[in-house]
Amino acid sequence: MAVGAAAVTEVGDTASPVGSSGASGGAIASGSVARVGTAAAVTALCGYAVIYLAARNLAPNGFSVFGVFWGAFGLVTGAANGLLQETTREVRSLGYLDVSADGRRTHPLRVSGMVGLGSLVVIAGSSPLWSGRVFAEARWLSVALLSIGLAGFCLHATLLGMLAGTNRWTQYGALMVADAVIRVVVAAATFVIGWQLVGFIWATVAGSVAWLIMLMTSPPTRAAARLMTPGATATFLRGAAHSIIAAGASAILVMGFPVLLKLTSNELGAQGGVVILAVTLTRAPLLVPLTAMQGNLIAHFVDERTERIRALIAPAALIGGVGAVGMLAAGVVGPWIMRVAFGSEYQSSSALLAWLTAAAVAIAMLTLTGAAAVAAALHRAYSLGWVGATVGSGLLLLLPLSLETRTVVALLCGPLVGIGVHLVALARTDE
């Protein structure tokens, strides 16, 4: 016998996977977007607060060291967001699929726990080969916190995916906010106590326990965490592997760019600290909320599976409009904001900030087309697009240009490769 969404079961029980809203509603409805949008705004503010406190507490040289760890953690957790994407797609797609009632089941949260443990072992075990090149200070503490923090984040990302797939947007937003607030609390304590670089490294990973707090305090979150999806664990892992590869490539551009910059530069120094801060400030207004709404976007594109290219138009127009305003604002008031907010040592030109904002728009568009590819189960095209964009950006960083110029060229032109790959694949599915 074949069944639809009811085939998703909780451990030891049978339940609908869609919460109170139902499968068909809520992905980009005003209520869910407002809740996730509010959570994204709070998350962005908290992220800015951590960056601000670190920049004020550390000189540009010290901030470049912190920025590399911040980027390294963003890189590995960005890759782990592939678990969020695949879990969202698996759970959400069940409303449109027929599955065998007596087939095998997968418990995504348990699988992600195994993935997290494996990631911890790989990072810690391989660290003697690369950590000396990446972490200039607090090397072994950085390795330990990177490994443990990633293990926790694998569970965090999967739980977000289960909440998104079941329309539990209030809990989805609460989990995001809990992560961000924990980080800023530790950063504020570091600023007051004077813990310097070590404290900000701790602050970076502190939010990785947020998933556990949500499970302890939220019954709807516990209900989502118990869900099982049809199919073998190997099937889930194959889909997740493509998403993780692509998400890892995207994370290099979105969060891990300071690491890529470090690996392609002899010495970052104070100039590198200014460039890293400029990249962070210009992209956060677009990419933080867009990343936070990955669950909404994937669910939306699954629902609009018959016209995926057309479904891209409205969000792409919104991103373009916000980006145009952002470019103007960055060019006019950006240098002044950097001097006033972070100190006279952080000097940046209007042109650099405006072009970096344009580069953020390119990455945002790539993120959007990538979400559509995931929703269409185009895992190979999704990963190929992001890997192509990352390789392109990495090669452009090797150009014999100034640090500022090659940063802009790499971040602006590299994503165009991936956008093209995604659009071609999506167009073929609509034929």
From Swiss-Prot:
Keywords associated with the record: Cell membrane, Membrane, Transmembrane, Transmembrane helix
InterPro entries hit by this protein: Poly_Biosynth_Transport
Protein family: To M.tuberculosis Rv1510 and M.bovis Mb3654.
UniProt protein name: Uncharacterized protein Rv3630
Membrane topology: Multi-pass membrane protein
Organism: Mycobacterium tuberculosis (strain ATCC 25618 / H37Rv)
Keyword Ribosomal protein listed: no
Membrane-spanning parts: 33-53, 63-83, 111-131, 143-163, 175-195, 197-217, 241-261, 273-293, 318-338, 358-378, 381-401, 407-427
Cellular component aspect of the GO annotation: extracellular region; plasma membrane
Subcellular location: Cell membrane
